[in-house]
C-alpha cells in the first residue's frame, strides 16, 4: 500500500473558519525544523459552503496536501465526507485529522488522546480515580468523555445548563455516563477525583463560573480545556482550594502529534521548548 507521503511532498494544513488565530502552524513548524524536514504546514481557510469541494480536491490530489487538521466548524463534515473514518471518529461523529491512503481520505479524532496525554504528563496517576465530573455538553465534551471512559473511569457525570444535551451524551457513550442539570453540580462533585471544564466559561472576555471545589476528593485534579488565559479563573479557584490543576495548553500540543506522524513519518515529542514558544505567542497576541 502506498501512503500519502509517496504521492505528495510533505505538505499539510489546518483548516477552519476562521483560521487565522490557529497556533497549529507554530506547533508543526517547530517539529518540522526540529527534524529537518523540508515540508510545510499552513493555515488554509475554507468556508463551510466550500468545504465539500475542498475535500473533493484533497481526495483527487488537487490541493497538493497529504493531509491535515480540521477545526471548528468543519469537524462533523470532515467525518461525514471522509472515506475511511476510524472507530474513534465514528463514535464522536467528528474528525480533526485527515490523511490520504490510495486516493482515499482517512480520518480520526485525536482530541481525546491529546486530553489524556496532557493529564498523564501533568497529573500522573490521575486515572486511578473512579468518578469524573465534566462540565458542559457541547462538541468539545464528546472527546473528553470518550477518552476518560476508555481509560477506565467507571462513573462520569456530565453537567450542563440544558439537561437534554447532557442526556444526549449519556445515550451516546453508554452506561458509565450520567446526565445532570447544573443545579446538581455540587452533589455530583462529591468524592470525584477529576473535574473537567469543557465550556468557554473563564475564557478571555467570558464571565468566570463561581464553583466551590470542596466536595471533590482530596488530591483531585481540576482541568480546563481552555488555554487562553493559561490559568483560567476556574483553575485559580481550584488551586486556592488545594487541588491539583492542569491547564488546557497541553491538550492542544499533544493532539497534534499523531497527525504529524501520519503526514511526515516521524513521531514528535511535546517538550517544554514548544510549550514556551506557544505561551510567548499567546502573550504577544493577548
Curated annotation (Swiss-Prot):
<comment type="pathway">
    <text>Metabolic intermediate biosynthesis; chorismate biosynthesis; chorismate from D-erythrose 4-phosphate and phosphoenolpyruvate: step 4/7.</text>
</comment>
<feature type="binding site">
    <location>
        <begin position="22"/>
        <end position="24"/>
    </location>
    <ligand>
        <name>shikimate</name>
    </ligand>
</feature>
<keyword id="KW-0057">Aromatic amino acid biosynthesis</keyword>
<dbReference type="GO" id="GO:0009423">
    <property type="term" value="P:chorismate biosynthetic process"/>
</dbReference>
<dbReference type="InterPro" id="IPR011342">
    <property type="entry name" value="Shikimate_DH"/>
</dbReference>
<dbReference type="GO" id="GO:0009073">
    <property type="term" value="P:aromatic amino acid family biosynthetic process"/>
</dbReference>
<dbReference type="GO" id="GO:0019632">
    <property type="term" value="P:shikimate metabolic process"/>
</dbReference>
<feature type="binding site">
    <location>
        <position position="71"/>
    </location>
    <ligand>
        <name>shikimate</name>
    </ligand>
</feature>
<feature type="binding site">
    <location>
        <position position="227"/>
    </location>
    <ligand>
        <name>shikimate</name>
    </ligand>
</feature>
<dbReference type="InterPro" id="IPR041121">
    <property type="entry name" value="SDH_C"/>
</dbReference>
<dbReference type="GO" id="GO:0005829">
    <property type="term" value="C:cytosol"/>
</dbReference>
<dbReference type="InterPro" id="IPR006151">
    <property type="entry name" value="Shikm_DH/Glu-tRNA_Rdtase"/>
</dbReference>
<comment type="subunit">
    <text>Homodimer.</text>
</comment>
<dbReference type="Pfam" id="PF08501">
    <property type="entry name" value="Shikimate_dh_N"/>
</dbReference>
<dbReference type="Pfam" id="PF01488">
    <property type="entry name" value="Shikimate_DH"/>
</dbReference>
<feature type="binding site">
    <location>
        <begin position="160"/>
        <end position="165"/>
    </location>
    <ligand>
        <name>NADP(+)</name>
    </ligand>
</feature>
<dbReference type="GO" id="GO:0004764">
    <property type="term" value="F:shikimate 3-dehydrogenase (NADP+) activity"/>
</dbReference>
<keyword id="KW-0560">Oxidoreductase</keyword>
<comment type="function">
    <text>Involved in the biosynthesis of the chorismate, which leads to the biosynthesis of aromatic amino acids. Catalyzes the reversible NADPH linked reduction of 3-dehydroshikimate (DHSA) to yield shikimate (SA).</text>
</comment>
<feature type="binding site">
    <location>
        <position position="111"/>
    </location>
    <ligand>
        <name>shikimate</name>
    </ligand>
</feature>
<feature type="active site" description="Proton acceptor">
    <location>
        <position position="75"/>
    </location>
</feature>
<feature type="binding site">
    <location>
        <position position="87"/>
    </location>
    <ligand>
        <name>NADP(+)</name>
    </ligand>
</feature>
<feature type="binding site">
    <location>
        <position position="248"/>
    </location>
    <ligand>
        <name>NADP(+)</name>
    </ligand>
</feature>
<dbReference type="InterPro" id="IPR013708">
    <property type="entry name" value="Shikimate_DH-bd_N"/>
</dbReference>
<dbReference type="InterPro" id="IPR022893">
    <property type="entry name" value="Shikimate_DH_fam"/>
</dbReference>
<dbReference type="Pfam" id="PF18317">
    <property type="entry name" value="SDH_C"/>
</dbReference>
<dbReference type="InterPro" id="IPR046346">
    <property type="entry name" value="Aminoacid_DH-like_N_sf"/>
</dbReference>
<keyword id="KW-0521">NADP</keyword>
<keyword id="KW-0028">Amino-acid biosynthesis</keyword>
<dbReference type="InterPro" id="IPR036291">
    <property type="entry name" value="NAD(P)-bd_dom_sf"/>
</dbReference>
<protein>
    <recommendedName>
        <fullName>Shikimate dehydrogenase (NADP(+))</fullName>
        <ecNumber>1.1.1.25</ecNumber>
    </recommendedName>
</protein>
<dbReference type="GO" id="GO:0050661">
    <property type="term" value="F:NADP binding"/>
</dbReference>
<feature type="binding site">
    <location>
        <begin position="136"/>
        <end position="140"/>
    </location>
    <ligand>
        <name>NADP(+)</name>
    </ligand>
</feature>
<feature type="binding site">
    <location>
        <position position="225"/>
    </location>
    <ligand>
        <name>NADP(+)</name>
    </ligand>
</feature>
<comment type="similarity">
    <text>Belongs to the shikimate dehydrogenase family.</text>
</comment>
<feature type="binding site">
    <location>
        <position position="96"/>
    </location>
    <ligand>
        <name>shikimate</name>
    </ligand>
</feature>
<dbReference type="GO" id="GO:0008652">
    <property type="term" value="P:amino acid biosynthetic process"/>
</dbReference>
